Amino acid sequence: MIEVENLSFSYGRRKSKVLEDFSMKLDKGSVYGLLGKNGTGKSTLLYLMAGLLRPQTGNVLYKGVDVKKRYPDTLQDMFLVPEEFALPNVSLKQYVKLNAPFYPNFSDELLNACLRDFDMNEDIHL
């Protein structure tokens, strides 16, 4: 479960807040959509929820733990794919070998099943 409590955030010295006293609760096992116009704070909220930004006020709790603390046990369950990102110049196999240890719940079997579903193999280059 993710709980957002009275979250307020603004970038730099901007007077207008991107989020102000925002609260919500997301239950485990549910699927949610985040809709809004460009520049209304959707990405900012996701970065706050992942602990990558710090709010001016309020808290984000993931399984009861404040995400600002960035505990490894908390981070191993979190995945955030930004809108734009750079992939390293390695094969998928190399990428998995380097990063899978950080995610104890990572499943080679599930990855291989997904690759088969899309007629791909782990030797593809990122």
Please report, for each region that a protein language model flagged, where it lies by residue.
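A position-specific signal in ABC ATPase nucleotide-binding domains
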Residues: 12, 53-55
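Conserved A-loop
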Residues: 10-14, 62, 103
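The feature captures the beta-strand-to-loop junction immediately N-terminal to the Walker
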Residues: 32-37
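ABC-family P-loop ATPase nucleotide-binding domains
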Residues: 82-126
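Conserved ABC transporter NBD signature motif
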Residues: 58-69, 73-74
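Helix-to-loop junction immediately C-terminal to a conserved catalytic motif
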Residues: 50
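A short, flexible loop at the N-terminus of ABC-type nucleotide-binding domains that lies
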Residues: 1-21, 28
